[in-house]
């Protein structure tokens, strides 16, 4: 099998909705969260995730949710994304407990934390993403009668451009501390775009601000994902998504960048570290996945 060229389906000004290109990966992750919610002993329950899948009409994800797997291999990616979801949930809970009242979810996708988490009074949650993605989420949650548990503000913007101005125009206060999440975004950015993203976040972050990042230390290699499915037949990584063609090879280390730009960075953890902290024993398939993805979960403060 020949590995597709990395980023071959991308361009500097490409766009997408929730069922195409990078947007579909948000739907895929929502599917994994929905599967994790119905698995034994879930770390988190995102009951909105299944509504996004139903509304999308995607045949692959609809079929998977209709007949969820039960083996360790079948639950591998739902389990790993359950761990990731818990990490970011805990981050925002801790930020709120510390008195931070501005949360910014970068590349919000189908994130439902504004509706799921128990936010302190007077908290504003800013969700930054492309307009088509935000419109889909608002429509689906509106049809469900969902009510956010904080003041939720949509910021329609391309994260490869200057999104800081739309954020400030939406009411973001640069003089007040903020909590930022960058979840599942970095593989889809070039190195230059990643630097620009962190530069803008740093420029908007008052003293006392915090950031949480989920990153990968290696590229999303098509051959490795295929080999994983061959060696663990229950694993179904992505349906027909070609991650190699949608992502770029990582060059910069986010933790090193933050440390060099005025952030105090906590010890970096991987998925296996998080699982241990949640009292879980990672199955062999999880160890293998993290062996080639080299996950990084980063928290830092100013």
From Swiss-Prot:
Amino acids binding S-adenosyl-L-methionine: 129, 158-159
tRNA processing is among the record's keywords: no
GO terms, molecular function: methyltransferase activity
Gene3D superfamilies in UniProt: Vaccinia Virus protein VP39
EC number: 2.1.1.-
Reported function: Exhibits S-adenosyl-L-methionine-dependent methyltransferase activity.
The family this protein is said to belong to: Belongs to the UPF0677 family.
Protein name per the record: Putative S-adenosyl-L-methionine-dependent methyltransferase MAV_2803
Organism encoding this protein: Mycobacterium avium (strain 104)
